[in-house]
Amino acid sequence: MKKSLTSLDLNLLLCLQLLMQERSVTKAAKRMNVTPSAVSKSLAKLRAWFDDPLFVNTPLGLVPTPLMVSMEQSLADWMQMGNQLLDKPHHQTPRGLKFELAAESPLMMIMFNSLSQQIYQRYPQATIKVRNWDYDSLEAITRGEVDIGFTGRESHPRSRELLSLLPLAIDFEVLFSDLPWVWLREDHPALREAWDLDTFLRYPHISICWEQSDTWALDDVLQEMGRKRHIALSLPGFEQSLFMAAQPGHTLIATAPRYCQHYNQLHQLPLVARPLPFDAQQREKLMVPFTLLWHKRNSHNPKIVWLRQAINTLCRRLI
């Protein structure tokens, strides 16, 4: 028999979402500012309502049942719509409005000063939270923890980061496309040699750990050629790799998007750029579409629409 929503305490759905996010009764209780016992009692009520265990206890934490997994997206959508409904008054008087962004650095560092000024000019009492883009950022957008993401995707046909492979719930807009370049210290010995593939591969490389991987489309292209680069150092992001490439006493080289020239100028890094020594077809596989990403439920959210427009305008002016 179909159950009536009026007989369900809606606070239980918030508890259910937090349990799905945390996979722990204790952590969910901490986020709700209640005792673990209270969360356990709520979970018992939810199990009775859905006639399903919902979660199974394991040494690694709570593991959702197939029914719980099937409900995850609908639950996140429902909670997000509830938050938007409660935020309606803030569209007229935007006190306490929050902006949650996940962005690739140094891209955000180039534009953040201008973007934050625009946000505070329009919403003087807004708060802004920026996190680095990482392997969990798409899930954070889906869960409603991030309003909008700004990052590069890949173009190589074998890449896991193709725009065509984004989850169906994610909308996106490509703001610009960029080709990675090679960045070397001004006195790097490679600059005294003919710039070709052999020179490029002769020296140790700095790579970045992207989406929990130390390799990317560049390494796929090299593999197709029967070649491989020596990755001597892996770092969390482009800004760290550029900083290290600029330091004396080593022959490391970095590969980073061409837009990083703006970052280098801003921080006066003594770096010289060289194009990747590949043909046009190979370079096409390395093209990086820099993309805004948001959840479909936010496509008409006034705050998100305004933020997208602001970032779009800044990109055209700064990049």
Curated annotation (Swiss-Prot):
Disulfide bonds: none annotated. It holds the Pfam family HTH_1. Residues 25-44 bind DNA. Residues 8-65 form the HTH lysR-type domain. PANTHER family: HTH-TYPE TRANSCRIPTIONAL REGULATOR LEUO-RELATED (PTHR30118), HTH-TYPE TRANSCRIPTIONAL REGULATOR YIDZ (PTHR30118:SF11). Involved in anaerobic NO protection. This is HTH-type transcriptional regulator YidZ. The gene is yidZ.
